[in-house]
């Protein structure tokens, strides 16, 4: 079984990383999230989370970010190849419960996994 850690190397942290991913990446979406993804430059998958102020107050935005990061931490092994992913929250996700968000992320990551095969 793989590691369930979420280290700094597995995060998109700098603006140029997000911009580069936006330029070279593919997009998939569902009712609550948009994912921009591209094959990773390194050997590990990396996650970025974008939740704008349109989604809700700070408490709501932080809850959504925690939910996305936790889902990635537990399910990163399901990605077939190393992928850089930026998950963008839509306004519709602000009033949903965590299990529904996890199901939505599951659907999204399945589509990312299918689209990331080389």
From Swiss-Prot:
One of its GO terms (molecular function) is ribonuclease P activity. Keywords: Endonuclease, Hydrolase, Nuclease, RNA-binding, tRNA processing. PROSITE patterns: RIBONUCLEASE_P. InterPro entries: Ribosomal_Su5_D2-typ_SF, Ribsml_uS5_D2-typ_fold_subgr, RNase_P, RNase_P_CS. GO terms for cellular component: ribonuclease P complex. The keyword Calcium does not apply. Its EC number is 3.1.26.5. Signal peptide: none annotated. It is an enzyme of class 3 (hydrolase). It comes from the Bacteria. Gene3D superfamilies: 3.30.230.10. The keyword Hydrolase applies. It catalyses: Endonucleolytic cleavage of RNA, removing 5'-extranucleotides from tRNA precursor. PANTHER family: RIBONUCLEASE P PROTEIN COMPONENT. RNaseP catalyzes the removal of the 5'-leader sequence from pre-tRNA to produce the mature 5'-terminus. It can also cleave other RNA substrates such as 4.5S RNA. The protein component plays an auxiliary but essential role in vivo by binding to the 5'-leader sequence and broadening the substrate specificity of the ribozyme. This is Ribonuclease P protein component. It comes from Desulfatibacillum aliphaticivorans. The lineage of its organism: Bacteria, Pseudomonadati, Thermodesulfobacteriota, Desulfobacteria, Desulfobacterales. The gene is rnpA.
């Amino acid at each position: 079984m793989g590691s369930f850690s979420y280290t700094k190397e597995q995060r998109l942290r700098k603006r140029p990383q997000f911009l580069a991913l936006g330029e070279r990446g593919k997009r998939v979406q569902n009712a609550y999230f948009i994912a921009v993804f591209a094959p990773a430059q390194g050997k590990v998958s990396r996650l970025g989370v974008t939740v704008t102020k349109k989604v809700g107050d700070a408490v709501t935005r932080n809850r959504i970010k925690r939910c996305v990061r936790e889902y990635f931490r537990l399910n990163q092994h399901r990605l077939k190849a190393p992928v850089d992913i930026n998950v963008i929250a839509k306004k519709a996700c602000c009033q949903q419960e965590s299990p529904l968000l996890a199901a939505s992320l599951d659907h999204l990551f399945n589509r990312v996994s299918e689209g990331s095969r080389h």
